């Protein structure tokens, strides 16, 4: 509903941190379990289509949408956004500094049950250690070609060279340091500011009229990144606790910046 307020073709890009919809975890893996898991992921895909349709409307032709998601749901995110009109471009890999193994350790579980064959399952696990997150990259279709689109709308290309990194930018991003913890930011999935700044800088030229929109603003990292880069932004967040955190972070960023424009949709 908040996105409905935005004008058609008004915004230039999108950096998002949505609920991941990773599905069921525990329970007996019977037919009903798999059926319910399938129903959940299809409901999740439909939910993505619902907000994706509105985002497609407000973005300029050639604008990119970047969507953080889990490795288990990235395919459904891409299909959902393609269904509403976006064109699939890439998947960016954000390689984190560490990952915690999750799932069943067969040897330890069998040992706790007194199973004599436990040692035979040494090193066997129900999942790999996950140390990367998928960032689905889609684009609103161009107007005929890239050059025509950038002349009309000032978006459509990706920055591949920058003083912030060496060589030609790849679709694997790593060596991003975590932000230091502070006493007031209680958001559980805060993305590193350096990462979000890198992504915004990669897909949005610093040209008047370009606006970053984040419909899942959370604690405000996208807003802070935009302020630091000197780019206008729109943030939408429904959780009142996160809104207050975002306001505090935005005000701190403004105090350290010459940019005095703030757009925070409550």
Feature annotation, model-predicted:
Residues 1-266:
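S-adenosyl-L-methionine-dependent nucleic acid methyltransferase catalytic domains
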């Amino acid at each position: 509903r908040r996105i409905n307020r935005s004008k058609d073709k008004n915004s230039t890009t999108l950096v998002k941190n949505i609920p991941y919809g990773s599905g069921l975890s525990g329970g007996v893996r019977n037919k009903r379990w798999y059926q319910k898991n399938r129903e959940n992921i299809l409901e999740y895909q439909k939910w993505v289509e619902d907000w994706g349709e509105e985002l497609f409307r407000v973005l300029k032709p050639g604008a990119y949408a970047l969507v953080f998601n889990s490795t288990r749901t990235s395919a459904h995110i891409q299909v959902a956004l393609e269904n509403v009109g976006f064109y699939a471009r890439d998947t960016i890999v954000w390689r984190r500094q560490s990952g915690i193994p999750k799932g069943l350790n067969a040897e330890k579980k069998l040992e706790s049950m007194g199973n004599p064959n436990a040692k035979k399952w040494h090193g066997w696990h129900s999942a790999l250690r996950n140390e990367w997150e998928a960032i689905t990259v889609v684009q609103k279709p161009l107007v005929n070609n890239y050059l025509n689109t950038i002349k009309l709308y000032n978006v459509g290309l990706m920055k591949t060279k920058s003083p912030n990194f060496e060589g030609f930018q790849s679709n694997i991003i790593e060596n991003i340091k975590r932000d230091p913890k502070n006493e007031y930011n209680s958001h559980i999935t805060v993305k590193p500011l350096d990462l979000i700044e890198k992504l915004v800088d990669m897909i949005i030229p610093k040209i008047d009229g370009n606006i970053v929109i984040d419909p899942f603003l959370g604690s405000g990292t996208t807003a802070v990144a935009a302020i630091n880069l000197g780019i206008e932004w729109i943030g939408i967040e429904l959780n009142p606790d996160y809104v207050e955190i975002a306001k505090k972070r935005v005000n701190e960023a403004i105090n350290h910046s010459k940019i005095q424009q703030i757009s925070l949709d409550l």
